[in-house]
Amino acid sequence: MKNQDQALIFEVSKEGRIGYSLPKLDVEEVKLEDVFESDYIRVEDAELPEVSELDIMRHYTALSNRNHGVDSGFYPLGSCTMKYNPKINESVARFAGFANIHPLQDEKTVQGAMELMYDLQEHLIEITGMDTVTLQPAAGAHGEWTGLMLIRAYHEANGDFNRTKVIVPDSAHGTNPASATVAGFETITVKSNEHGLVDLEDLKRVVNEETAALMLTNPNTLGLFEENILEMAEIVHNAGGKLYYDGANLNAVLSQARPGDMGFDVVHLNLHKTFTGPHGGGGPGSGPVGVKADLIPYLPKPILEKTENGYHFNYDRPEAIGRVKPFYGNFGINVRAYTYIRSMGPDGLRAVTEYAVLNANYMMRRLAPFYDLPFDRHCKHEFVLSGRRQKKLGVRTLDIAKRLLDFGYHPPTIYFPLNVEECIMIEPTETESKETLDGFIDKMIQIAKEVEENPEVVQEAPHTTVIKRLDETMAARKPVLRYAKPAPVQV
């Protein structure tokens, strides 16, 4: 039943079928022509589906059964921290005092919400070792861009207009160079060494008087802790640059180490990842940015302050980069993150990291005999395998990922980071049990054996899903982005 083909909602449509009947109009009717110019008014009715309420419910329920989420199964997507989202978060986010307020209300009427925001900022300051935090950015890449704009404002305020280059490692998230470009910087790549860490000699080579910042994830995207981080910070700071922390992998160091203590000047966090805001369906996210004291003047306005008279938003920020989002950030996700932090406490957050690292190392060691391990050393919250061995037998990493679908697992991240051939990046998170990990590991081992004994099974996977293999070339070159009503059948 679950894998049956599903008609489009347009194909279910029957002319004249009604889902809802609206009550009789009890206010004066307004003609569209009196409100909009003719250029904005349709000449013909939109071709919308005409379906009943039951049709709608069955259609979208059937589609939802095809989806894979954290609540339905293991989701080892590397560098995405697809951990379980506790349902207490949802209960708190639905409190009337949080769910039914409006950002344009008088500050005096939303002091409770403002108190939560302020306390969340204080918790994030303590967790990161920064001096203050803004909650405005909507998600990770938005946080990156905001942090880079702060760095740009800092350099320009100091008359340093020639700092136009941002350094990123060859293992960096793709959003890092993209954010740097959008912020007006040129991206310079620093190489990794044979241990998977930033090559210090290459860093010294690329750092100069044009360096605005070095963007790092620590641990990096290979799941390896940059053990030379203090020396790296010194190299960048001595050259007049700033050190930027991409918080994508913060789950690996919670209550164990703080970016601020490593020498970072700016940090963005992904509350929808590390702090259990639900994600994976396109948002919303939350990407707060923390900074050291010398960058505070440039934070987006307003900033939330606490006084003896309560909480208020301070707009008197002459050096601020301006707003980066309407109002005050994605409040609902921030409520969920606050709930998670308060329910876990310092000891709970420390345990998060301990179990995340334990799970990743357990999986890595069990899978290492069957797949290549590019960096054979202790990992943090995630690890990287390579399908080079399988590729020599005619099976690609993509095929392995497709085969996992047959067993009900969401595949790991593949072909990223780019500096590992046939890359398979796995992040189990701390919320998964040993039994769950073993089940996934057993299937990965089975696939490795199938590659050796019956490679066609893997090459032609998936076998049990509704959609098999897409024509990816055609999808990229000639995408079908809207429904086209079939032409009438000629009799």
Curated annotation (Swiss-Prot):
Protein name according to UniProt: Probable glycine dehydrogenase (decarboxylating) subunit 2
Record keywords: Oxidoreductase, Pyridoxal phosphate
EC top class, as a word: oxidoreductase
The protein's assembly and partners: The glycine cleavage system is composed of four proteins: P, T, L and H. In this organism, the P 'protein' is a heterodimer of two subunits.
Catalysed reactions listed for this entry: N(6)-[(R)-lipoyl]-L-lysyl-[glycine-cleavage complex H protein] + glycine + H(+) = N(6)-[(R)-S(8)-aminomethyldihydrolipoyl]-L-lysyl-[glycine-cleavage complex H protein] + CO2
Protein source organism: Bacillus anthracis
One annotated GO molecular function: pyridoxal phosphate binding
Alphabetical list of Pfam families matching this protein: GcvP2_C, GDC-P
GO biological process per UniProt: glycine decarboxylation via glycine cleavage system
SUPFAM superfamilies: PLP-dependent transferases
E.C. designation(s): 1.4.4.2
Alphabetized NCBIfam families for the sequence: PRK04366.1
Keyword Oxidoreductase in record: yes
PANTHER family recorded: GLYCINE DEHYDROGENASE (DECARBOXYLATING), MITOCHONDRIAL, GLYCINE DEHYDROGENASE, DECARBOXYLATING
Cellular component GO terms, alphabetical: cytosol; glycine cleavage complex
Modified residues (N6-(pyridoxal phosphate)lysine): 273
Cofactors named for this entry: pyridoxal 5'-phosphate
GN (gene name): gcvPB
